[in-house]
Amino acid sequence: FSRWEHLGPVNDVKLFRMNPDCTNMQAIAGQFGKSFNSIVQAQEVPGEPGTFVTVATSRRGTIQAGAVMHVDARSQTSTNPDLYIDVQQARFTNLTPDVPTGMGSPPSGVGRYRTPRSIGDGLLLVSWADGDVNERNELADTAPNFGIYLFDPETQRRTLVYDNPDMWDVYAIPVRPRDEPPVITPTVDANPDPSEPAIIGSIDITATSLRENVNGAQFDGVPLGEALAQATRMRIIEGFSSEIGSVGQFGLTMHEGAAILGETPIYEDGSWRAAVPAYLPYHLQPIDRYSIRNQMLWIQAMPGETRTCGGCHESRSDTVEPRMGATTIAQQVGPDMSTHIAIPDRVELPWYGAPSRENVQDVLTRNCAGCHDGGAMDPYAGRFYTVEVTTMEGEMLTFEIPYLDLSDRLIEAYYEDEVVNYPASYVSLMYPSAMMGDSMALGDVPPEWVVPGEARASRVIEVMNMTAEGDAGDLAWADRPLHPEDQGVDVSREDRMILIQAADLGGQYYSRWNVEGGYDWSAAADY
């Protein structure tokens, strides 16, 4: 099945598989190596497990139509028959190379495809429509016409099978004998108790196949595996949508709503286990003694299901073994139950306007706005940059954004095709990273004070610095002092952690607790 993956800058559709009881959800293809945005309408090639024909599309305004793509997700290195799929080794072959797959979906004169299905001898049954098959059809008030065709990828020839011009002809299935699929025995109760927790964890978080380097704070080009060895806790974050209330976006960020269920310990062998509410989407942040890091993939589990990965993006073709014996320390200790908590007990970080919660603005007002409020004592007083925006209607708008103002006075900005009002602190810190392609910044443009999802790369976190847990003399950026302590103002480690968490969660303005007219979650017993 195809799954929409939206987490901050990640916004695409990937190919997944799972058991009929919705357990053991795994990525098959699309996380690595694809040159297009989205994989949709995939069908496994009969007799070739791990290979698929699918549609590659740019996602936006294409009616899920695009090029026909062959996906080979079989591992090229594994000798274990149970590990024959490897998302990291998936290969993509465009069977209709003339069909563009870029985000712009330009005119090509070759039409677009939907719902391919292999019928043997290299032939495919497809739906095809002439033209661009995108939003330009709406502008021209001309709907695309999909008919059913037999397609030969080798010759690029289409043979018409059926076309009713009054409707779309899609999802054609050949009527023919097929092998009865095997029965997969359920691993969870057919009628599970939704309050029963799922268990998630890792064998060894240092096991990774990603060849990435980590920078920021104590790291300067350190390989990811070495950086993960310094992780002390796993932060577990629930994601939720704007259905919580009357908001289209969660602020000047592409990140979703976020709530921290807890930070469970990572043991000396790299293992961890935690109980979490079932069904919900989570992403994980392995954090070090300074409380900083991130991971960009949603995971889910059923009630009573145990999901244990090998590491952090470990090789899907290898078996990860415990470092210190037959079982991990986390297995011996048992799952951390403190993370199986109801909605009111989860940590959310509304920026402003949540009367029953600590707001990010409360931290800034308490520690920072006394100097950075645009007044006479502010070293950045009078500094600003100008943002020019051309709206979809062609109107030119101009906004003055303060270089750094951490007060709660409301100012205007432009984001996602609308004029928005937020506290100056939020716009100052978030706008340098939030400006879209329809904006042009002129003048005294500041650094990216907050990089959503990356506290380690956020300038404001670097300037303030952070102390290690249990050692106030151990600084994340060892070559610079704590700020504003160097100016005679003391900030608690707890307040610093709120700012770090706000950045690492994605820099959201809204949470469940500050949406006007939203539900009162204070008495909610839901998981």
Predicted features, each with a name:
Residues F1-R3, T51-A56, L124-W128, P181-V183:
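Residue position within the beta-strands of beta-propeller blades
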Residues G8-R17, R60-D72, N80, V133-Y149:
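Structural motif
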Residues E212-P223, A231-M234, E238-F240, Y279-P281, ...:
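Aromatic- and Gly/Pro-enriched helix-to-coil junctions and flexible linker segments
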Residues N19-T23, M69-A90, E154, L160, ...:
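Short loop/turn segments immediately following beta-strands, especially the blade-tip
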Residues N11, F36-Q41, Q64, R112, ...:
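Beta-rich catalytic cores
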Residues M25-F36, T77-P107, N164-D179:
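Surface-exposed loop and turn segments in beta-propeller and other repeat-based domains
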Residues F36-R59, T101-D121, P177-D179:
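Signature of short aromatic-glycine-proline-rich micro-motifs recurring in repeat-based ectodomains
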Residues L252-D269:
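Short, acidic Ser/Thr/Gly-rich low-complexity loop/linker segments typical of extracellular
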